[in-house]
């Protein structure tokens, strides 16, 4: 397998998802809503989920040449989700004995728009068979629509599991990730258990865009079901640890009477933890989002109270299996969401270790 790496220094639990998710995310099908509206999609998604959880079965169809894959990821952040995801993808592709060439570009989230645009156009010019990208901003959406309208390259959209309604007749090859609404609702349910009498809270968003809407607004919407919980403040960040620190300080200086902070990403949560320590407010609970290595270390240290842990490698494996199905001429589902588990600092190290072995079953391999 030929691998081309461009390093850019520019940056199984199922939860009941509210029927109001599509109200929070206007213009998108909620994950479960989509599967219910299109029953055959539900069948295909469940079949792919089974394959993801099982051992790989090598490709039996002959390939006349390697397939070409381009990857543009916002991987330069403390969260190791993207790097692990790609590692799991490549290892599963190798286990499936698929011949491929891959071109990778990692950038910072919410930055390097010019670099992303250049990399994306290069992927199209090289006539990649598959392009793995994400959708968070309006700029991303315009590029994706260009690909859907004018290219034979098959588009895999990472970190989104809510199909765009306007693309109904020309959906991407695959939406894949861990459903943000599902994870956020699981965290909301846990906070309600932790504060049965109610609580005041603040929200630290990711940068403006889809992820903040899906994680932050869904959480607020869910907490609003009870009048015992009061949102005191909400701040957008720059999706970095430094901005999480600054936003947490600003929030607590203006609205000190809070019981917990809901953070929409790893980097934001870790920055907020530093602010809580500096201000002597470690009595305030705070969550992570994703349950990667940095968050699990913070939970072990007692700095992070809880997180929703993605079974991280599920999505990398799902992308590889979807490509295998495509090569074999099988119908691929439109959307796939991996599994979650809620983890708290009260959980035993043994329990967390078992979850890590499941979540990182490929990406922890040498």
Swiss-Prot record:
Q: Main localization of the protein?
A: periplasm
Q: Name one Pfam family in it.
A: Peripla_BP_4
Q: Where in the cell is it found?
A: Periplasm
Q: Which SUPFAM superfamilies match?
A: Periplasmic binding protein-like I (SSF53822)
Give a GO molecular function annotation for the protein.
carbohydrate binding
Which cysteine pairs make disulfide bonds?
Answer: none
- Homology family: Belongs to the bacterial solute-binding protein 2 family.
UniProt function note: Binds to an autoinducer molecule. This complex then interacts with the LuxQ sensor protein.
Q: What is this protein called?
A: Autoinducer 2-binding periplasmic protein LuxP
Organism for this UniProt entry: Vibrio vulnificus (strain CMCP6)
Originating gene: luxP
């Amino acid at each position: 397998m030929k691998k081309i790496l461009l390093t850019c220094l520019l940056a199984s639990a199922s939860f009941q998802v509210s029927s109001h998710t599509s109200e929070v995310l206007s213009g998108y099908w909620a994950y479960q809503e989509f599967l219910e509206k299109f029953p055959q999609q539900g069948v295909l998604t469940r079949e792919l989920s089974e394959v993801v959880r099982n051992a790989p079965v090598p490709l039996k169809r002959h390939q006349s040449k390697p397939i070409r894959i381009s990857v543009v990821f916002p991987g330069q952040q403390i969260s190791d989700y993207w790097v692990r995801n790609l590692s799991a993808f490549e290892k599963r592709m190798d286990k499936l004995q698929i011949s491929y060439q891959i071109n990778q570009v990692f950038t910072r989230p919410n930055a390097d728009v010019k670099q992303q645009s250049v990399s994306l156009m290069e992927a199209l010019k090289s006539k990649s068979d598959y392009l793995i990208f994400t959708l968070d901003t309006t700029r991303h959406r315009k590029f994706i629509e260009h690909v859907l309208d004018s290219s034979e390259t098959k588009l895999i959209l990472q970190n989104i599991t809510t199909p765009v309604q306007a693309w109904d007749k020309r959906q991407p090859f695959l939406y894949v990730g861990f459903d943000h609404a599902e994870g956020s609702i699981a965290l909301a349910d846990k906070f309600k258990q932790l504060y049965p009498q109610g609580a005041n809270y603040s929200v630290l968003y990711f940068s403006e865009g889809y992820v903040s809407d899906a994680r932050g607004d869904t959480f607020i919407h869910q907490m609003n079901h009870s009048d015992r919980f009061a949102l005191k403040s909400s701040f957008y960040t720059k999706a970095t640890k430094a901005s999480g620190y600054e936003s947490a300080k600003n929030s607590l200086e203006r609205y000190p009477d809070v019981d917990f902070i809901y953070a929409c990403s790893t980097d934001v949560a870790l920055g907020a933890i530093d602010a809580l320590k500096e201000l002597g407010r470690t009595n305030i609970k705070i969550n992570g989002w994703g349950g990667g290595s940095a968050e699990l270390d913070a939970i072990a240290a007692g700095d992070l109270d809880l997180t929703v842990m993605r079974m991280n490698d599920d999505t990398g494996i799902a992308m590889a299996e979807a490509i295998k199905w495509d090569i074999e001429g099988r119908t691929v589902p439109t959307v796939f969401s991996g599994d979650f588990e809620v983890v708290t600092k009260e959980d035993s190290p043994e329990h967390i270790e078992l979850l890590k072995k499941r979540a990182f079953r490929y990406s922890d391999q040498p």
